[in-house]
Each structure stands twice: as C-alpha cells, then as structure tokens.
Swiss-Prot record:
Pfam families: TCP. Residues 130-202, 220-245 are annotated as: Disordered. Residues 151-172 form the R domain. The keyword Ribonucleoprotein does not apply. Induction: Repressed by the miRNA miR-JAW. Induced by blue light. Stabilized by light but labile in darkness due to proteasome-dependent proteolysis (at protein level). Residues 130-150 have a biased composition (Low complexity). This is Transcription factor TCP2. Residues 42-100 form the TCP domain. The gene is TCP2. One of its GO terms (cellular component) is nucleus. Residues 177-202 have a biased composition (Polar residues). It comes from Arabidopsis thaliana (Mouse-ear cress). Plays a pivotal role in the control of morphogenesis of shoot organs by negatively regulating the expression of boundary-specific genes such as CUC genes, probably through the induction of miRNA (e.g. miR164). Participates in ovule development. Promotes light-regulated transcription of CHS, CAB, HYH and HY5. Positively regulates photomorphogenesis (e.g. hypocotyl elongation inhibition and cotyledon opening in response to blue light). The keyword Transcription applies. It is found in: Nucleus.
Length: 365
C-alpha cells in the first residue's frame, strides 16, 4: 500500500487545491490544541490535542511491524521528521479519507473558546501548584510538630532513665551500707548479741545462750517460761558422773554490777564465767536467777570421746527461789590439737524433775 501511494505520488506532479483546503483544517485549527502549563509538573509537559473522544496525546505509540514500515518510508522520502512522513501519507490517502463519514455532528471549540479554555487551564494549573505548595507547607508543619513531639518523648524517656539510674544507685548504696553495718556488728559480739536478744524473742530459753558473751553489763532480761518442755539428751549419762578437774573461773561481769538474786523478782540475772581446765580449752557457765522449774542443766560438749574427761566444766548456780531450782548451762570447746576430729557441739537437758538438793550437790565441787 505504501509503495502504491509512492508511485501515485511520483506520477502526479501537482496537488489539487481542494486537497490543500481540506488539509488546512488540520494545520491551522489551533483551537483544538491544549497546552499544558509547566507549573503542573510531571513528565507529560507537552501539549495535547482535542479530538471527538477528548484530549489525546500528540505522541503515538506504534507496534513493531508498523514502526519498521514507517521509518523505512521516512528514510525513502528523505524526511528528517516523522511528522512530515505522516503528512505525506495523509495527502496520499485523501480520496479514501473523503469517503469516510464526516464528523460534522462533533462540536469543536473556536479560537475564543480555546483561549478561554487555555486561561482556565492556566488558572487551574496555578491553583494546583498553590495547593501543592500549601500541602507541602502543611506537611512540613506536621512534620515539625511530629519532630517536636518526638523530642518531647525523648526528653521524657531520658528523664525516666535518669530516675531509674538514681533509684538503682540508691539501692546499691543502701545494700552496701547494710552489709558494712553487718560486718561492723559482727566484729563486736557483745553489741550484736544485745541487738539479737532485743529483737528476736523466742519461746525456747536456750536460744538466748548460743554465744559465750550475751550480756556484758549485768542487765536483767525477762524470758518466756516453758514448764511443759520435755527433757532430752544427746550425750550418755556417764559423762555427768565423770570426776571433774579443778578449774579457774573468770567472771565477765564486774561484781558491783551484779544485783542480788533475791531482788530480781523472778527475772533472769545472767552471770558468765570462763573455766580454764588444764589443756581442755575453755568453758563458760551461765546460771539463771529463776523462772524455770523443769530443767536441771544444759551442757554443750564435743562428740569426741577421748576428750570427755578433760572437757567437763564446773557449773555455777545462783538460786533465786527457796527451792533453789533453775536452769544451768555449760558451754565448752575442745583443745586446738584435736581440731581434726569431727566436732559437733550438742546441747541437752536432762533430769528436769530433780530436787533442789541434787542440784546443789552436783553444781558445786
């Protein structure tokens, strides 16, 4: 078809004026051109043309086969622009185009209307650009507000972190102080035992005699009385009948601080004496002034059988009642040369129902 058109074109030297008049409608009808303002932005900045089906792009996309034929025709015609080759094709097909139905029923705007449309288009484009600018400004304001809120959140988070750090530091300091106080109190057994006795009362009377130094100033302490306690023993009875050695007694309490037993009124008057047998370590005896009526004595001794003879200590009793009954306690430790044995100190009560004469007979040597 393209070859036939070219042959016909070569045969005809002059083009009819009527054909030129028909083509002039397309060449000089500027009212159908829609120009796009550059302010609107985007890639599609070239003008469009108004057709019966609305504005259309001036650029045409061709298929692969049509594009090959078209560019071959353009090269054969010697045109440097594709639009000139399209114009030549339209002129060559004028007869066939005239046979097609007309578009008289289609209303196209005149030049005045086109100018008005261009003005409206420009105004619309300007309004779009202003709205875009305003939206950008609003977005920037919103972003600034968000940034402010983020900064406030960060400040609050930092403040909370500082508070947590200060709290943890305070707790660590408190724990360190408590540990230091515990060490200091452990270095002073008299004060620690005083605090322990004052803060930890118990129904068992022997809990107050777990240390050799309980009360160092002759203070009077009231303890609960338990008369229904059952006597128990962890060491055989022959230990009590073993002959005692001579001991030297040392008092931990000055004599002028020891109040008379009769003025206690049933309260405990604690006196501590250290007995030092020859090569047998040390023993401390504590006697109560009264208040217990079901116990004879308690003895803390080692399980090592070869040291029983040299370990028994002298008991000292301070009767406060007419019957002279009251608990007596004995504490002792093995010599240093026998420390390789499995030392386990045990405390026992026995003979809780003995009379006062037996107490007096066994309490003194």
């Amino acid at each position: 078809m393209i070859g036939d058109l070219m042959k016909n074109n070569n045969n005809g030297d002059v083009v009819d004026n009527e054909v030129n008049n028909r083509l002039s409608r397309w060449h000089h009808n500027s009212s159908r051109i829609i120009r796009v303002s550059r302010a609107s932005g985007g890639k599609d900045r070239h003008s469009k043309v108004l057709t019966s089906k609305g504005p259309r792009d001036r650029r045409v996309r061709l298929s692969v086969s049509t594009a090959l034929q078209f560019y071959d025709l353009q090269d054969r015609l010697g045109y440097d622009q594709p639009s000139k080759a399209v114009e030549w094709l339209i002129k060559a097909a004028e007869d066939s185009i005239s046979e097609l139905p007309s578009l008289n029923n289609t209303h196209f705007p005149t030049d005045d209307e086109n100018h008005q449309n261009q003005t409206l288009t420009t105004v619309a484009a300007n309004s779009l650009s202003k709205s875009a600018c305003s939206s950008n400004s609003d977005t920037s304001k919103n972003s600034s507000g968000l940034s402010l809120s983020r900064s406030e959140l960060r400040d609050k988070a930092r403040e909370r972190a500082r508070e947590r750090t200060a709290k943890e530091t305070k707790e660590r300091d408190h724990n360190h102080t408590s540990f230091t106080d515990l060490l200091n109190s452990g270095s002073d057994p008299v004060n620690s035992n005083r605090q322990w006795m004052a803060s930890a009362p118990s129904s068992s009377p022997m809990e107050y005699f777990s240390s050799g130094l309980i009360l160092g100033s002759g203070q009077q302490t009231h303890f609960p009385i338990s008369t229904n306690s059952h006597p128990f023993s962890s060491i055989s009875d022959h230990h009590h009948h073993h002959p005692h050695h001579q001991h030297q007694e040392f008092s931990f309490v000055p004599d002028h601080l020891i109040s008379p037993a009769e003025s206690n009124g049933g309260a405990f008057n604690l006196d501590f004496n250290m007995s030092t047998p020859s090569g047998a370590g040390a023993a401390v005896s504590a006697a109560s002034g009264g208040g217990f009526s079901g116990f004879n004595r308690g003895t803390l001794q080692s399980n090592s059988t070869n040291q029983h003879q040299s370990f028994l200590a002298n008991l000292q009793r301070f009767p406060t009642s007419e019957s002279g009954g009251g608990p007596q306690f004995l504490f002792g430790a093995l010599p240093a040369e026998n420390h390789h044995h499995n030392h386990q100190f045990q405390l026992y009560y026995e003979n809780g129902c003995r009379n006062s004469s037996e107490h007096k007979g066994k309490g003194k040597n």
